[in-house]
């Protein structure tokens, strides 16, 4: 099992609408794709003063291949949607985490 982690840097001016979109649209789409089984949505705690907030979305998948298939099928649509909704107010990067225990 792996965790597909995406960390978002979210501007204060779109924070509320971003969380609403993630909870009501993005997470349900990810789970209903069949490639992910569980999720955790968290705020990243930092000591620094920064503009905006960092949000982590962790989705559990069977393996890296499942995430690759999701990216092939839905990755472009996700990128277009997040860009059209939030423009430069939301930036993100993704990483893979292997579940050890």
Labelled PLM ranges:
Residues 2-9, 42-73:
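Short, well-ordered beta-strand segments in beta-rich or mixed alpha/beta enzyme
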Residues 19-22, 58-60, 98:
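Generic alpha-helical hydrophobic packing signal
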Residues 63, 73-76, 95-96, 100:
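Mobile, glycine- and charge-enriched loop segments
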Residues 40-53, 80-101:
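Glycine-rich beta-strand-turn "strand-cap" elements at beta-sheet edges
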Residues 15-41, 77-81:
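Short amphipathic alpha-helical segments
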